[in-house]
């Protein structure tokens, strides 16, 4: 994304081993890392010119989450715009004055809300209480997160669904799927719809 005055642009790069945001000054070629830490930027949504900041989504609070965040063009402090936890999927107005956020968690259907540029919720647009009640009525089992540690000490996230009336003293058959590819987080704190 180019800065409107033509002085530079922002991009994401894995230069430090994590996907982070950098600004580049066109005249000097100087690069400034705007975000840093042991987490990945998922997407750059654009530049909020009025507030001189970059709006983006990232797995900052937890690798299973997707947060909506902002960072000033000078890189001084990341601001949380969405509620913590779960998966937040924003749609921004022109100029980034408002955004509609669709947020869900592993066992909670999407809730759609309207927020101002500082992240304050202005209005609840859709709460999906009817869907949540219907799911509860069917008595479906809930998903649970777990973490495995490999022989190399790497922690891997997973989720499981146990049979109804699960008894830990019993043995059950297991159906397992896995993904071994790079750069794709398949274990998300997000409503799964058909997987519920």
Which residue stretches match the model-derived regions?
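Short flexible coil/turn linkers enriched for glycine and charged/polar residues
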Residues: 15, 62-63, 75, 106, ...
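Hydrophobic beta-strand positions that form the internal "hydrophobic ladder"
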Residues: 8-10, 53-54, 99
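Short, solvent-exposed loop/turn segments that connect beta-strands within catalytic domains
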Residues: 63-64, 74, 167-170
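Structural motif
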Residues: 17-22, 63-69, 107-114
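Multi-bladed beta-propeller domains
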Residues: 1-4, 13-14, 24-50, 58-61, ...
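Serine-hydrolase catalytic core recognition
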Residues: 87-196
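C-terminal substrate/ligand-recognition segments
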Residues: 2-16, 148-154
């Amino acid at each position: 994304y180019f800065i409107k005055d033509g002085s530079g642009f922002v991009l994401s790069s894995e230069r430090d081993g994590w996907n982070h945001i950098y600004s580049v000054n066109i005249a000097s070629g100087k690069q400034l890392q705007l975000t840093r830490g042991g987490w990945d930027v998922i997407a750059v949504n654009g530049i909020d010119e009025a507030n001189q900041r970059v709006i983006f989504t990232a797995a900052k609070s937890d690798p299973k989450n997707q947060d909506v965040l902002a960072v000033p063009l000078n890189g001084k402090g990341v601001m949380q715009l969405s509620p913590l936890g779960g998966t937040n999927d924003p749609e921004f107005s022109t100029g980034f004055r408002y955004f509609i956020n669709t947020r869900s968690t592993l066992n909670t259907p999407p809730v759609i809300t309207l927020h101002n540029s500082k992240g304050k919720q202005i209005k609840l647009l859709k709460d999906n209480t009817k869907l949540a009640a219907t799911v509860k009525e069917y008595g479906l089992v809930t998903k649970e997160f777990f973490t495995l540690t490999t022989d190399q000490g790497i922690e891997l996230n997973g989720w499981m669904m146990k049979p109804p009336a699960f008894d830990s003293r019993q043995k059950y058959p297991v159906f397992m799927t896995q993904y071994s590819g790079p750069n794709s987080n398949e274990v998300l704190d997000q409503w799964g719809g058909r997987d519920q």
